[in-house]
């Protein structure tokens, strides 16, 4: 591999076991990090607002819960796992006043550091540990003695051993069992945003909706169009997930593969690639970040409008009816057992 990958033998858990880690936030990633850190012998404190609905859950699981400011004051390492748009105010109000020299500030995503929304003092370590999987999977793999690969990066090395500390954190949540890949805040942030916007969320959703529209506008039944453009997407993605595009093409019919190879490049052509490059350019220049921060500060008017418009798309009503015929989709995909 062209990247550096680190495993259990490369990480010293002792670097983190003698310290207190504050996990700020207790959502999907927060609960997985906190419980796995605790089970790895790390002293953990959860930082949540007094009225947070997650407080009882964290306390029921045997974790100490304090306000974000109290947790930050107590901790040697502060991991911020709150939503991107909440982090700047959270940092300014609750963390910065307690960020003494020698402490470490960790992130699960590089957005606020990459775009300068948070600017830590020079005398603290700034690092990132970002598992490449949802929190429930991170926790399940840890409990099973396995792990989820993660990205590890250092933006500021005040101590001289920030990367070693980040690797220790990754090991404590099971990441080095599978492999911790060294990256940078810039690379993680820019590729993550691009994947979300152009491929995984924006690109895929737009492709599915447009395909549904083409079929229904041509007179085909919405139910049949739903199956062909949305429902069966999972079958294809699962094959790609398990063994790449080659595995998918090996598993489908020759007719499907010929259509894939001969027609796919006509759908995603050089013009689409140029528009994808333009989207990447907006991410790299900071244009997207500035737009999103301004949208959030303005109360998210465009976001709310676009969300409502998408929710009203005919594919949603059709899908809701058809999923009533599918007993196997009653169980939430995030439910683990």
UniProtKB/Swiss-Prot annotation:
Residues covered by the KARI C-terminal knotted domain: 184-329
Database matches in SUPFAM superfamilies: 6-phosphogluconate dehydrogenase C-terminal domain-like (SSF48179), NAD(P)-binding Rossmann-fold domains (SSF51735)
Domain named KARI N-terminal Rossmann: residues: 3-183
Cofactor-binding details, from the entry: Binds 2 magnesium ions per subunit.
Keywords from the UniProt entry: Amino-acid biosynthesis, Branched-chain amino acid biosynthesis, Magnesium, Metal-binding, NADP, Oxidoreductase
Catalytic site positions: 109
PROSITE patterns: KARI_C (PS51851), KARI_N (PS51850)
Native organism: Salinispora arenicola (strain CNS-205)
GO molecular function: ketol-acid reductoisomerase activity; magnesium ion binding; NADP binding
EC number: 1.1.1.86
Protein name (record): Ketol-acid reductoisomerase (NADP(+))
Function: Involved in the biosynthesis of branched-chain amino acids (BCAA). Catalyzes an alkyl-migration followed by a ketol-acid reduction of (S)-2-acetolactate (S2AL) to yield (R)-2,3-dihydroxy-isovalerate. In the isomerase reaction, S2AL is rearranged via a Mg-dependent methyl migration to produce 3-hydroxy-3-methyl-2-ketobutyrate (HMKB). In the reductase reaction, this 2-ketoacid undergoes a metal-dependent reduction by NADPH to yield (R)-2,3-dihydroxy-isovalerate.
GO terms under biological process: isoleucine biosynthetic process; L-valine biosynthetic process
Superkingdom as given in the UniProt entry: Bacteria
Reactions listed under catalytic activity: (2R)-2,3-dihydroxy-3-methylbutanoate + NADP(+) = (2S)-2-acetolactate + NADPH + H(+); (2R,3R)-2,3-dihydroxy-3-methylpentanoate + NADP(+) = (S)-2-ethyl-2-hydroxy-3-oxobutanoate + NADPH + H(+)
Family according to the record: Belongs to the ketol-acid reductoisomerase family.
UniProt: Mg(2+) 1 binding residues: 192, 196
Positions annotated to bind Mg(2+) 2: 192, 228, 232
């Amino acid at each position: 591999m062209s990247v550096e990958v680190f495993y259990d033998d490369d990480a010293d858990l002792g670097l983190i076991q003698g310290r207190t880690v504050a996990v700020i936030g207790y959502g999907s990633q927060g609960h997985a990090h906190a419980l796995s850190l605790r089970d790895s012998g790390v002293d953990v404190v959860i930082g949540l607002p007094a009225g947070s609905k997650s407080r009882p859950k964290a306390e029921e699981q045997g974790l100490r819960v304090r306000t974000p400011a109290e947790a930050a004051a107590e901790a040697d390492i502060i991991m911020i796992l709150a939503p991107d748009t909440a982090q700047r105010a959270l940092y300014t109000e609750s963390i910065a006043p307690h960020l003494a020299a020698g402490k470490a500030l960790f992130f699960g995503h590089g957005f606020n550091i990459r775009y300068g929304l948070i600017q830590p003092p020079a005398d603290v370590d700034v690092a990132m540990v970002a598992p490449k999987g949802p929190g429930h999977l991170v926790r399940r793999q840890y409990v099973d003695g396995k792990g989820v690969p993660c990205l590890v990066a250092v933006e500021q090395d005040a101590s001289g051993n920030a990367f070693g500390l980040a690797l220790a954190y990754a090991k404590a949540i099971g990441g080095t069992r599978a492999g911790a890949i060294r990256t940078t805040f810039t690379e993680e942030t820019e590729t993550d945003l691009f994947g979300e916007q152009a491929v995984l969320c924006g690109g895929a959703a737009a492709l599915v909706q447009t395909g549904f529209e083409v079929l229904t506008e041509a007179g085909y039944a919405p139910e049949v169009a739903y199956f062909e453009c949305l429902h069966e997407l999972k079958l294809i993605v699962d094959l790609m997930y398990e063994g790449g595009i080659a595995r998918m093409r090996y598993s489908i019919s020759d007719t499907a593969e010929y259509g894939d190879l001969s027609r796919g490049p006509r759908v995603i052509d050089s013009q689409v690639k140029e528009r994808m490059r333009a989207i990447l350019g907006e991410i790299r220049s900071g244009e997207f970040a500035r737009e999103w921060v301004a949208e959030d500060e303005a109360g998210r008017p465009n976001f709310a409008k676009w969300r409502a418009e998408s929710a009203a798309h005919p594919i949603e009503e059709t899908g809701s009816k058809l999923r009533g015929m599918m007993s196997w989709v009653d169980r939430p995909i995030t439910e683990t057992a």
